[in-house]
Design a protein with these regions (language model features):
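Extracytoplasmic
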Residues: 1, 5-263
């Protein structure tokens, strides 16, 4: 080994660089539904629901109409309809529920289920919604509107989305509202979105803490060896195994998120 140290050093350097380049392939993201593996019944059940029934994640908007009874305004319903259409055009969106959709269905039902009337009513929307609220059970009638009819809920069910994709989808919806209906804008919310933001902040904190640890280790080595050159040089053999391992993970797997063990 000593006799052939330079060829070995060159070969190991090339191998380390090639494997370490896989770090660039790592996607720092995760999926809440994949925190547990298939040994757990919860994971098997959620996989079945996602594959055969519906999505597991949802995004909600509580959109103010500007005052009591204003949810029946045509302009407001058009804004809801536009936001719903934007969501449906996004990949992975399974279902959108809003007062605009209910109004179109009620308008169609009023006209004998004629498909041509599956549209927002130009007039009489308030009376239409009032009839529905009076006839439907209280919990059903309040599923999309509040008691004063001043705010309505728009709900979105999405399929297999990662935390980053959920954040991106919600940010796009907020941007659409800010551009097209700022008077009715309300930020996207929801339990899935909350976990998506927690995931993003955890990843940011992990990267910052790793960089801070590297700086502190470098400073300690420089102080211990009393040489900036030797201190920085000594980082190479200490960091190389970690970089190679992460690079190999990047080439073979690609995703790096939260890992959950049996403990």
């Amino acid at each position: 080994i000593v006799r052939h140290r330079w060829p070995l050093f060159a070969a190991m350097s090339v191998l380390a660089i090639a494997l370490g380049a896989g770090v660039s392939q790592i996607d720092l993201d995760d999926r809440f539904g994949e925190y547990l593996d298939n040994r757990y019944e919860f994971r098997r059940d959620t996989d079945f629901v996602a594959a055969h029934l519906t999505g597991l994640d949802s995004i909600e908007h509580a959109l103010p109409a500007g005052g009591p009874g204003r949810v029946a305004d045509v302009e407001y319903l058009r804004a809801l309809d536009g936001l719903g259409d934007w969501y449906r055009a996004q990949p992975g969106v399974v279902y959108v529920a809003s007062l605009a959709e209910m109004s179109k269905r009620l308008n169609q039902a009023r006209h004998g289920e004629d498909p041509d009337f599956y549209r927002l009513p130009e007039i009489g929307a308030a009376a239409l919604l009032g009839e529905y609220a009076a006839a439907a059970p209280a919990d059903v009638a309040r599923a999309l509107v509040d008691e004063s009819f001043s705010t309505s809920r728009l709900g979105v069910i999405v399929g297999d989305h990662s935390s980053r994709q959920l954040r991106h989808l919600a940010a796009g919806a907020d941007a659409w509202l800010a551009s097209n209906a700022p008077q009715y804008a309300a930020p996207a919310t929801g339990l899935a979105l909350m976990y998506a933001h927690v995931s993003g902040r955890n990843i940011e904190a992990m990267l910052i803490s790793t960089a801070a640890a590297l700086v502190l280790i470098s400073a300690l080595l420089i102080f211990a060896l009393r040489s900036p050159f030797l201190g920085l040089l000594s980082l190479l053999p200490n960091l190389a195994p970690a970089v190679i391992a992460l690079g190999l993970w990047g080439w073979l797997v690609g995703d790096l998120g939260l890992a959950v063990g049996d403990s």
